[in-house]
Every structure is written in C-alpha cells, then in structure tokens.
C-alpha cells in the first residue's frame, strides 16, 4: 500500500501512532510532503526514523528549505521566526557532523514527485496556458522549487488542472481553507487534495492526516 502524509512538524508521537494505525510494514511505501520538523518538540526523532527507513520518502517543504538557506547563509532569522528553534536545539545536541549530514540530505530532496496519476508536492505548481499539451515529464520538469515549496495560489483552482492527474498538497492547513476548526479533515477540491490538517496546531483542533493512494481511504490521529 502507498500512503501520503504532510506537515508533521515535529509531532513524533502522533506520527508513530499513525504508522501503527495504518499497520505500516516493510511492504508499504510512505511519502511525506515536507515540513517534517520545526514547531513541534520532537523534530529530529521523526527525521531520524525516516533516514533509517528505505520505504519512507521525504519531499522538500518550505521548512526544509529554510533550514537549508540558514545553513548556507548563517542567517537563522527567517527559520527561527517560523519555528526552527525547536529543531536547532536538537541539532546542537547531536554528534559532530550531524548538521552537515542533514544539510546534504535536505539539499538533494526532490520537491515534486509523480506516483501513477498523482502529483505530490508540498505547496503549489505552475500551470502554463498550454499545460495539457505537455507530457507529464515536460510538465514536471518545468516546475520551479520556490513555487512548489511556497505558492498557495494555483493548486485548487478549477482552471488549474493537468489532464486527469490529481495534485496532493500540504502547506496550507485545511482550517485556513474552511475558516473553521470544526470537522477537520482532508479536502478534495477540483483536481487538488489538501492533506495538511494542522497536526501541530492543537488549539485549532489540529490532526495528523494520512491518505492511502490505493483506495483513497483517510486516516486521522
């Protein structure tokens, strides 16, 4: 079975409970659409679990990108403003060389991936006017990292589709889309599927969501 999660944000306990709920095994595959750390109190526990699992695949999110840029520039301000302090504290307590290893790993992460008829991405995509004349490879190859990690404007618009592909995204908590903390669940809108249920935001009734691609079953912790 193939599963997708996003925006776990250091919520390690919920992450482990989700793996137990879906009976995740070595025969399954899990794709995490970025933002695995920051804000929550156990960010590197999740990351270390992913690093040790051949069948769990991380895509880059904007929080991974902020760490990457902070490492390169030495300017931590944007990363810290967005909750990077919880991650940095754990990095400091790791062995020498861990931060460099983490940087090299994150630097190489993909920011968009196609699984059958699903396009997996953290935030958004660029839809050119002629996109339906393109092959899937051409469409994916024209995507830019900043759009895929930050953009909220395109995915979900009724005019922005690519053939019969569904686009699965995180980044924008569903509470921000519905303007409600009630009935928090995955949103299907047009060709887009929003799976960030704001796990780290408990005051907003945040949940960790997981979508099984094989039958579209939804799971929540």
Describe each PLM feature range:
Residues 24-25, 52-53, 158-162, 180-188:
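Short, conserved loop/helix-junction motifs that constitute active-site signature segments
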Residues 2-9, 118-124, 193-195:
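Active-site-proximal beta-strand elements of phosphoester/diester hydrolases
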Residues 43-116, 144-152:
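Active-site neighborhood of divalent metal-dependent phosphoester bond hydrolases
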Residues 9-13, 38-40, 64-68, 127-128, ...:
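Active-site environment of divalent metal-dependent phosphoester hydrolases
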Residues 188-221:
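Binuclear metal-dependent phosphoesterase catalytic core
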Residues 7, 35, 50, 61-62, ...:
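Divalent metal-coordination and catalytic microenvironments
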Residues 97-176:
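His/acidic metal-ligating clusters that form di-metal
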Residues 1-48:
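N-terminal active-site segment of His-dependent metallophosphoesterases
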